[in-house]
Amino acid sequence: MSTTFLSVMAGLSGIVVFGALISVFHIYTDINSFVDEAHRELGAFRGVANDAWNSMVNHDDSARVARSVFVRRQKKQSQCNCGPQASNCPAGPPGPPGASGDRGLDGQPGPAGKPGQPGVAGPAHHQQQECIKCPQGAPGPAGAPGNPGPQGPNGNPGAPAHGGGQGPPGPPGPAGDAGSPGQAGAPGNPGRPGQSGQRSRGLPGPSGRPGPQGPPGAPGQPGSGSTPGPAGPPGPPGPNGQPGHPGQDGQPGAPGNDGAPGSDAAYCPCPARSAAVFRHRNVAVNRHRAVAKKRVVAKKRVVARKRVVAARRHVQA
């Protein structure tokens, strides 16, 4: 069961992973297509923007001419012929420079130039001039220490020593390596015969450990008929048994006798009692007895249940 469950879960996991890979591939393809489309739209937008700019620049001169004509006409129409106008007035000071215009487009490339004439070797002019002698400058800072030079040659041998004498013996050297084993020696002469031995008898040793238990023996023969043995002593009392089921309710008791009539009141005589009064009294007494009996039965049931629960706990313990 566990192997089948694991196989099913492994198959479902593989399907989910395969679906995730396919989704990633689709998302990657969609992103690439979106990027390509965005680049194409940007290129088209740049082309439209360049065309619009070129058309605006080409029509700039005509727009300026039309604008100047319109402004002059507007100025002429805005003149007022209210009085004589001044004439031959001196020119006013030049106005402030206007705002710089937009940068114009690059011009068309000019035609290729004509090839130049071939070069001619000219005469060489050599003028010998003396070197300019400058005064000596201040000494520069000390340089870094140089690399060590090569080792010098060996010196001449010294003069021989005189009167040294032989020195004390040196300490013992380390032990040498073990030598190879020597050849076997010649066999020796036979030894003398030994003395005669004495026979002795030792004491018995201690007893050994008991051996393992042997196999069970064969069943014995049936015994001869004999009288039963005497009765053993009585055993200890056993535990209390479980409480029995509650018994059935008993039969309702017989109705009681009628009570004696009460004494009359002191202030007025009571009328004689009728049979309806006695019947009502009997019904009330019977009801009271039934209610009391039900209460007793309910108490007995509660006590019996408690005993059953206590017995179960005792058995479990």
Swiss-Prot record:
The keyword Hydrolase does not apply. It holds the Pfam family Col_cuticle_N. Residues 108-124, 135-145, 175-206, 242-262 have a biased composition (Low complexity). Residues 207-219, 230-240 have a biased composition (Pro residues). GO terms for cellular component: collagen trimer. The keyword Iron does not apply. Residues 92-124, 137-199, 202-264 are annotated as: Triple-helical region. Keywords: Collagen, Cuticle, Disulfide bond, Repeat. It comes from the Eukaryota. Nematode cuticles are composed largely of collagen-like proteins. The cuticle functions both as an exoskeleton and as a barrier to protect the worm from its environment. Collagen polypeptide chains are complexed within the cuticle by disulfide bonds and other types of covalent cross-links. Belongs to the cuticular collagen family. This is Putative cuticle collagen 80. It comes from Caenorhabditis elegans.
